[in-house]
Amino acid sequence: MNKVNGKKTSFAPIREDGSRITICYGLKKLSGDLYEWLEVYLPKKQTSTLSLQMVKDAIENDINSRVDEKILCSYPWTVLHGDDAGKDVKVWLSKENQSNFKAKYDLHFTKPESLTFPTIYKIAEDDDHNAVFEVFQNFEELEAFYLGGIAYIEQCYQAGWQEKSGIDWTPYEDYFKTEE
């Protein structure tokens, strides 16, 4: 995926140049005659006969990848305790971390007597790649963090679904009509 800025006259839904096919989508006006759009590239070697379904798959896969990336490394959190208290970070929500946070949260409902606080988690890295830790003093803090993460993931999915449903497929359909 590549973000491009240019004049609307430079935008073409599908371009074939050299060894690749460029699929453009998400055209947005920025200001005056300046626009922004996203491009996805398909190697011609792997695409002997381009189809509308291949174009749709490429665009939807690109949107899915951006949603996954946003979930993975963009959950905003302000550290509550410890050396990094007050620092705004982007929490690393890998599948493993999500599972660890969920396990600790669920333990409150299944075996509350086995929960101990304070508990500490590595939640991010700073710009110098040093670990950033959060110290949860009680279940309420852990719950706010965990439920905030769940809400953030849901927001990311909703934005992706909205982006997909907002795509006008007409220019791509027209492209294939002229190719016939």
Residue ranges of each PLM-predicted region?
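A preference for well-ordered globular domain cores
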Residues: 2-180
